[in-house]
Structures are given as C-alpha cells and as structure tokens.
C-alpha cells in the first residue's frame, strides 16, 4: 500500500510538471492537525517566486479537494525547495554535477556515515563524490538523505542576481 505522500505525489506530479515545476518533496506532518508540505523547484532553473508558490498551491489544493485523500482538515504549505534543496531522486544528482552536497548514509561506508563533497558523476545507480581530494563512490540505495550545500561562490552568485533584479 502506498503512503499518503506517494499518493499525493502520483496525483500532482504531472500537473506541476505541465506548469513548469519540479515536485521535489511531499511531506505530511502532524497528528491532530495535518500539514501537507510541498517543495517545488522551477524546471527552467529560475528562482521560485511567491507567485509560483501561490499558483502551485491553488492547483494542488483543487486536486486534493477533488480526490479527498486526506479526510480531516489540513494545512497546505507550498514553498521553494531552497538553495540547500534536498536531493530525493537519482536524477537530481545528475542535474547537480559540480555542486557541493551533504550526504547522510543508512550505514557506514569506509567507516563514515556522512560525506560532504562535490558531485563528480552520477551513473549506474552510483554517486561519485570528490571528498577531501579523494573520489568516493556511493551506491544510491545507501543514501539516507542528501542536500545541496550553500557555498560562498553560490552565495555571491545569489547576491549578484538579487542586486540585478533590484535595480531598475
């Protein structure tokens, strides 16, 4: 049986893609009052705006209301996946080759359960990571969680694009 998160993913993924968004993550939290948290990114690599979140939220809300997956009242939160976005699909590692990532493992690899390094390659269900001047090969199914890391270079790039968008 599918989890509620997987059922929601199956319902909204294609529609969000048609709207130009990648569905990054679906989480359902809370016991007495449910919160459905949806993280999105834009397929064109532009920044997710408040308008994007509103548009996606309205669409998702309509779909969830029609399908009636969640019987009790819930809050819907749609937001950007952020600069330190989670990597939840193998394809994410391919997309972010050259970027720094923090990876937590399900079990030890070379005596470690965490790695932070640069993604060199992602192929054959393996992630190749440059870590402390070494190459580490991590089987995808060994990864518990992973997030991009905000580096100084990325921060400067973000500041540069903010300054450009704020000038008229």
From Swiss-Prot:
Looking up SUPFAM superfamilies in the UniProt record yields: YhbC-like, C-terminal domain (SSF74942), YhbC-like, N-terminal domain (SSF75420)
Q: So which domain of life are we looking at?
A: Bacteria
What GO terms fall under cellular component here?
Answer: cytosol
Which classification does the entry list for the species? Bacteria, Pseudomonadati, Pseudomonadota, Alphaproteobacteria, Rickettsiales
Key words, A-Z = Cytoplasm, Ribosome biogenesis
Instruction: Give the protein's function.
Output: Required for maturation of 30S ribosomal subunits.
Is this entry keyworded Cytoplasm? Answer: yes
The record, for CDD domains, names: YlxS_C (cd01734)
Q: Which InterPro entries match?
A: Ribosome_maturation_RimP, RimP_C, RimP_C_sf, RimP_N, RimP_N_sf
Q: Name one GO biological process term.
A: ribosomal small subunit assembly
What family is this? Belongs to the RimP family.
Primary gene name: rimP
Q: Where in the cell is it found?
A: Cytoplasm
Q: Which PANTHER family match?
A: RIBOSOME MATURATION FACTOR RIMP
Pfam families assigned: DUF150_C, RimP_N
Q: What is this protein called?
A: Ribosome maturation factor RimP
